């Protein structure tokens, strides 16, 4: 028996697929997620502001019983809004709050704090955050086999960027 895919059936299936992809962001708690592993960069857009991470560097710090892991990607903010947007860590009173979670090779999660300087991305421009840095601290914590989720919270919405 030969099965034919009609134009109408194709459009229904394509619409269902597009809806499934769009809804995957709501399942993870993020509004817009874009993962571009082939291009070695990831980006997320919230309204008129787009956040991009690429070319990451990891460092292990050594301290007594605890180690810190520093994650330093190249971070760019494309601000297509009509006014400058401020960014910083938790407690900075900035419009964009930057946080992260590091998951080690055993699946244990460590909160990451933004350790760069607070700043402002000018309106209508692509802006590189010069000292973007997230730091996690934990016992016997090392970067090998770890992954990071960086979260940008802006106007009550979250954009999550995944790096393995």
Each predicted region: which residue ranges?
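N-terminal secretory signal peptides and thylakoid transit peptides that target proteins
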Residues: 2-18
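Low-complexity, acidic Ser/Thr/Pro/Gly-rich terminal tails and inter-domain linkers that flank the onset
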Residues: 36-66
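Short, solvent-exposed loop/turn segments enriched in Ser/Thr/Gly
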Residues: 67-74
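Asparagine-centered strand-capping/turn motif at beta-strand->loop junctions
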Residues: 77-81
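Short, hydrophobic/aromatic beta-strand segments
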Residues: 83-92
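Short, solvent-exposed, Trp/other aromatic-anchored flexible loops in extracytoplasmic proteins
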Residues: 107-152
């Amino acid at each position: 028996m030969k099965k034919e895919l009609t134009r109408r059936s194709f459009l229904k299936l394509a619409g269902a697929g597009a809806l499934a992809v769009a809804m995957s962001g709501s399942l993870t708690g993020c509004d817009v997620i874009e993962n571009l592993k082939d291009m070695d960069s990831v980006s997320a857009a919230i309204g008129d502001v787009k956040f991009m991470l690429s070319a990451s560097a990891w460092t292990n710090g050594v301290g007594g019983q605890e180690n810190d892991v520093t994650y330093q990607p190249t971070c760019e903010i494309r601000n297509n809004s009509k006014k400058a947007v401020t960014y910083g860590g938790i407690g900075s009173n900035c419009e964009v709050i930057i946080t992260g979670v590091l998951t080690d090779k055993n699946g244990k999660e460590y909160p990451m704090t933004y350790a760069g300087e607070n700043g402002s991305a000018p309106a209508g421009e692509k802006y590189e955050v010069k000292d973007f840095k997230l730091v996690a601290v934990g016992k016997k914590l090392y970067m090998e086999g770890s992954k990071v989720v960086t979260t940008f919270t802006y106007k009550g919405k979250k954009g999550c960027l995944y790096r393995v």
